[in-house]
Amino acid sequence: MSTPPAPAPPLLIACALGIERLALRLGERDGTGGPVTVLRTGMGPEAAERSVARALAGPALAGVAVLATGFCAGLAPGMHPGDLVVAEETRDPRGSVPCEGTDLLVEELARAVPGHAVHTGPLTGTDHVVRGPERARLRDAGAIAADMESAATLLTAARAGTRPVAAVRVVVDAPEHELVRIGTVRGGISAFRVLRSILPAFREWHRNVLLPRR
């Protein structure tokens, strides 16, 4: 009798806000691509680091792929709420973490939410909401978007062991479309709808990064 294959390791999706977790749960379609755990970390880099480190310390999530997602501030002129950002790397003052499967994510996201622009480049981490002139400074340093948790999430995941990592964010405000309060303006609603639609792309990324290297 042949031995059944071992179950695929799960995908850990980390987000900061309850509204982000709600969007992901509403968007779940089926179980293809392996099991998924959605972790709400809380806001800010310190909360993300604590929450992810605690999750990865347990045996149930040992060796899992980690994907950071949620909303972000777009830094490049011409970005709009609902645009997507696929990080080539995440960075903060402690260093940078390269992301895996960027091209595949771009392809799958374009299929999941046709008509929404997908931007690629460095995603920078901050410890506060960025506005006005600070956006320009971060853009001049090479980043295309900013958020408070992705860099801390991926750095913590990388330090916990070798694993695939990625970050995908939905632009909720941009230089020409600054957001006052998430969920109260059109930009926030648009970003929520996009986030609700992209879990299938994450599952496909996960399925592919689990394939043996050639």
Give short role names for the model-derived ranges.
Residues 19, 43-50, 104, 148-152, ...:
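Conserved active-site and cofactor/substrate-binding residues in soluble primary-metabolism enzymes
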Residues 24-25, 78-79, 97, 131-136, ...:
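Short, well-ordered secondary-structure micro-motifs
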Residues 40, 68, 86, 122-125, ...:
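Structural signal for conserved beta-strand scaffold positions within catalytic alpha/beta enzyme cores
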Residues 101-166:
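Active-site rim beta-loop-alpha module in soluble metabolic enzymes
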Residues 176-214:
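His/Asp/Glu-rich mid-to-C-terminal helical/loop segments that flank catalytic regions of hydrolases
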